[in-house]
Structure formats: structure tokens, C-alpha cells
Amino acid sequence: MIIEEAQAINSFFRSESSKEVYGLIWLLVPILTLVLGITIGVLVIVWLERKISAGIQRRIGPEYAGPLGILQALADGVKLLFKEDLLPSRGDIRLFSVGPSIAVVSILLSYSVIPFGHHLVLTDLSIGVSLWIAISSIAPIGLLMSGYGSNNKYSFSGGLRAAAQSISYEIPLTPCVLSISLLSNSSSTVDIVEAQSKYGFWGWNLWRQPIGFIVFIISSLAECERLPFDLPEAEEELVAGYQTEYSGIKFGLFYVASYLNLLVSSLFVTILYLGGWNLSIPYIPITELFEKNQTSEVFGTTISLLITLAKAYLFLFIPISTRWTLPRMRMDQLLNLGWKSLLPIALGNLLLTTSSQLVSL
């Protein structure tokens, strides 16, 4: 009798432990899938930028590594992975080593609230866009740590510039996001997309918030440190800015963080202003178009994912083309644009949005 009870207890604990293991596996599956998708997305961005840049400069661009050179970015990443990781002899090794990781991880966390399609979001939080703004302000801390830990005047100046630039353009970005939240009556990224679904192309927040859209684009370009806002790593002034002392995989992490941030900004422009996963046809939401059975739902989810990515990658032509068409700004011009121009415009836009919402009540 006692042996049977002991066997029953052992089988119970085994079943419970197996359930925990399966639960952990199913918890990791969407996270790993998201990381894999993000990695592929970054490789596509690098290839697009090289091809578009080559077209602007009348060159061919990468063409040998894989079909049409699409594997060139992967080859560069593997090369950096096997390069020697040098450390500054008089620098703060802990800050020097942790800085790139903080920059990458903080940007990766932003993807958790991005709805890539219908039912394709890792966590649908009621404070989704607010969480993104809070998380995006962590990355400059990693850059400042990298600059300070390098014990190099160029690196430290680049880190200080990155922190100043991020603060200057994070503040105008926030009123633009608050204006969208007021129009949608929610800070959830999913609710914001669904609020734009009724009228198709004409229901996009782009038409209701044109001022906020322009301010958001400029601020997001500055957050990504893209030309003409690449002052933290200006080659002519600071060698390579906060990246000067880095080599190997740590050096590659900064480039990964830059392209991750660019993809995040493009996806948030798509979600906040361009209707997200919705079609451009009025009164035909994609959620109702493919809800007849399970197969239709899977097909609809795939279509919504493709629509979101198509909008995001089409928007990427703006930051890529500005890299080769606009000159770099001076530091005083950059700060004046953020504090004296964009911030008053963003606050005025928020005031107008609030007033219109109060009048419509």
C-alpha cells in the first residue's frame, strides 16, 4: 500500500515537472521566433541600404555574397564575430563591456509591444507606447557608459553627444505619441491600429496628425542617429565617437543597435500613423475579411504581417535617402532644432488635439 502511494506521488510530481518544462518551452517559442524575425529584418535593412545607396551613387553595391548580395551583411557579421576583442588598458572594463549590451537589449525590449499583424504581438499592454518611450531612453545610458569606459576623449565626447541628442529629441517625441493616444482613447498599440481601421486609407492618423507626423519623423531620425543627426559618431570630428575603442563583436553590436532602432522607429511610424496591419480599403478591416475559419485566420494573420512589413520597409526609403542628400548639422543647430522648434510645435499640436477632443465630447 505504501509503495503504491509512493509511486502515485512520484508520478504526480513527474507530471507536474513535465508541465512546467512544456510551459517554459511554449513561453520561449514566441520570444525566439521574434528574435529570429528581427535578425532577418535587420539583415534585409542592411542590404536595402547598401543597394539604395549604391543606386543613388550610380554603383552596383553588394552582389557576390548570395543572390543579389543579400548575404553580405551576414558575412560581415561573421567576420566581426571572429575578430579580436581588444580592451583599453586604462579604461573601465566593466562599463566598456556592458555598454553595447545595454544599448542592444533596451532596443530589443521595444519589440515586445509592437503588433506585427492581427494577433501577432508578444504583449498587448495598455501602456504600450508609453513603455516604448520609457525603454528607448535607456539606450543612451549604454552609449554614455561606453564613451566613459573607453577612457578616450573622442569616445567620451561622442557619449555625451548621444545623451544630449537623445534627451533633446525624446521630449518632442512624447507629445506626438500622447496626441495619438488621445485620438485613439488608448495607449495600447493594438487599440491604436484598430482605431484607424474603419475608413481605410483615409482613417490613418497621418491625415489627422500631419504636424505630429513630421515632428515624429524628425525626432525618430535623431533618436536613430541617422544623417543629418549622426553627431555622436561624426567621423571628421570624433573619429568614430563612442565606438572608437571598440573592435570585434562589441563593435558589431553598435551597428546592430543602430539598425534595430531604425526598424523600431519605422514600425512605430507604421503603427501610429499609417494604419498598421490594416488594408487601405475603407470599411473592410482585415480582421473581418479573414475570420470564417481557422485556415482563413492564419491566412489573414500572414497577410496582415506582410502589410505591416511592406509599410515599414517603404518608409525606410526616407532615412536611407536623407543619408546621401542632407549635410550634417552642427551641435548647436541640432539642439536649437530640438528645443526651440520641435518642442514648441509638438506641444502646440498636443494642445490642439486635446482641445478638439474636449470639443467633440
Curated annotation (Swiss-Prot):
It is an enzyme of class 7 (translocase). Pfam families: NADHdh. One of its GO terms (cellular component) is chloroplast thylakoid membrane. This is NAD(P)H-quinone oxidoreductase subunit 1, chloroplastic. It catalyses: a plastoquinone + NADH + (n+1) H(+)(in) = a plastoquinol + NAD(+) + n H(+)(out); a plastoquinone + NADPH + (n+1) H(+)(in) = a plastoquinol + NADP(+) + n H(+)(out). Keywords: Chloroplast, Membrane, NAD, NADP, Plastid, Plastoquinone, Quinone, Thylakoid, Translocase, Transmembrane, Transmembrane helix. Its main location: plastid.
